[in-house]
């Protein structure tokens, strides 16, 4: 992969990128190829850019939003001598532990910067990730106690850790079990910055600078929950695997419509009879219809008595489907399938012939 540096701009650029088209209001520079040797220390490159960004925001006396995405712990891991040297016979570390040590140092550098500049008590800091463990590439991809992993509709593919720090606002040491989605961060942050109505405003249409936006956000403002003032405002989670709605969670109950017996790299099978799981009672999804599943015979009896609940999931799916009429999906889900690649090539050829 190549690396790129992007800067937002007030000027709309007419430059064209071969893959993405018109650049728009940003400046893009080629930052070179990300060779395996460079992968050893690219996180330090990213960290330095982040620290410089904080310095500039402080100098300009402006609020800032920093989204820092180190490569650790994403496959494939190439360790620098410093972190490779942390592995020894006494600790028996794999590349996972050594890579996590590097990630810990990166996070520590950012927290130290905030403290040194007197910003730590007035800054919301969140540590989280975008998907569950990619356990089929262990040890790089990590491990999880939950069923499945990245790319699946099982809990191992969707559940992620989240740690939040906001001194004076978020109670220290508090553990919250309310349902929250990554889509909730945007409305929550905007509410914390002073606008709790951003979802409703964008739904109606909102002017931001010279740009007009009219979009449907699926996120909820969760400031009350994170501040310990109330429960989660979210009751439902939609589990999309690429473009397929594979499961829905409503409070404690999860309704799963597909199976992926070989994980993300295998085929997706549509189930004639959905699997119902009470995630409070069975968070690891060990029971179900699958041959050999624990308690599978007793599960059928339990399923019959809980079948009435499917009316709830039908209503939720109908609600989200209705939003797609005015706000249709902006793009198809990604796929490594050859048919999808052929479709992309054909689309590109048609676009070229129309010029």
Model regions and ranges:
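Loop/turn elements at helix/coil->beta-strand transitions in domains of secreted/extracellular proteins
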Residues: 59-66, 119-125, 159-160, 231-235, ...
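Single conserved hydrophobic/aromatic residue that forms the stacking wall/gate
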Residues: 1-12
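Long, internal low-complexity/basic segments
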Residues: 62, 250, 255, 261-262, ...
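The substrate-binding groove and active-site-proximal loops of carbohydrate-active enzymes
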Residues: 30-44, 89-102
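Active-site His/acidic residue clusters
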Residues: 50-96, 134-136, 140-144
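Short, solvent-exposed turn/loop segments enriched in Gly/Ser/Thr/Pro and often Arg
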Residues: 66-78, 127-133, 240-244, 327-340
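Metal-dependent active-site segment of extracytoplasmic phospho-/sulfohydrolases and closely related
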Residues: 62-63, 69, 102-138
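Substrate-binding rim/cap in mid-to-C-terminal beta-strand-loop elements of soluble/periplasmic
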Residues: 108-116, 142-231, 283-287, 292-293
